[in-house]
């Protein structure tokens, strides 16, 4: 028998999580005065008047570095809990981490050979 009251706390939590950002955006939208004008669409340059067009296109190499950084940053997030509980997890977890690191190294070598890490 399916008891729906078991999930009441989940639904309340979900409702609160959805309503808090909506409430915050609604309050600022209605409470703040409207600010229309040409200054609204310009970029802020630490008080200095912007020179030229401020909307520039970034080269793809910046995105590749950001992508590689993100991958290895997430790897660190996965490896830290494993490292803190290394002795309790045993040999199977050690082999899994070795496979995980090996896959990341293969990806890094592939990106390196494709020139994704070349700056010039």
Swiss-Prot record:
Top-level class of the enzyme under EC nomenclature: translocase
UniProt subcellular location: Plastid, Chloroplast thylakoid membrane
Transmembrane segments: 7-27, 63-83, 89-109
Catalytic activities: a plastoquinone + NADH + (n+1) H(+)(in) = a plastoquinol + NAD(+) + n H(+)(out); a plastoquinone + NADPH + (n+1) H(+)(in) = a plastoquinol + NADP(+) + n H(+)(out)
GO biological process terms on file: photosynthesis, light reaction
InterPro entries recorded: NAD(P)H_OxRDtase_bac/plastid, NADH_UbQ/plastoQ_OxRdtase_su3, NDAH_ubi_oxred_su3_sf
Alphabetically ordered keywords of this record: Chloroplast, Membrane, NAD, NADP, Plastid, Plastoquinone, Quinone, Thylakoid, Translocase, Transmembrane, Transmembrane helix, Transport
GO molecular function: NADH dehydrogenase (ubiquinone) activity; quinone binding
Topology of the protein relative to the lipid bilayer: Multi-pass membrane protein
GO CC list: chloroplast thylakoid membrane; NADH dehydrogenase complex
Its EC number(s): 7.1.1.-
A Pfam family the protein falls into: Oxidored_q4
Subunit structure: NDH is composed of at least 16 different subunits, 5 of which are encoded in the nucleus.
Xref: HAMAP family: NDH1_NuoA
Family listed: Belongs to the complex I subunit 3 family.
Role according to the record: NDH shuttles electrons from NAD(P)H:plastoquinone, via FMN and iron-sulfur (Fe-S) centers, to quinones in the photosynthetic chain and possibly in a chloroplast respiratory chain. The immediate electron acceptor for the enzyme in this species is believed to be plastoquinone. Couples the redox reaction to proton translocation, and thus conserves the redox energy in a proton gradient.
Protein name, UniProt field: NAD(P)H-quinone oxidoreductase subunit 3, chloroplastic
Organism: Adiantum capillus-veneris
């Amino acid at each position: 028998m399916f008891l729906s009251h078991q999930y009441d706390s989940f639904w309340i939590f979900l409702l609160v999580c959805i309503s808090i950002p909506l409430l915050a955006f609604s309050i600022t939208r209605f409470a703040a005065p409207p600010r229309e004008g040409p200054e609204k669409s310009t970029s802020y340059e630490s008080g200095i008047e912007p020179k030229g067009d401020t909307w520039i296109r970034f080269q793809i190499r910046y995105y590749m570095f950001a992508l590689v950084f993100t991958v290895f940053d997430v790897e660190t997030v996965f490896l830290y809990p494993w490292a803190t509980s290394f002795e309790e997890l045993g040999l199977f977890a050690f082999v899994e981490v070795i496979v995980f690191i090996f896959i990341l190294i293969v990806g890094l070598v592939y990106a390196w050979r494709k020139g994704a890490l070349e700056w010039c």
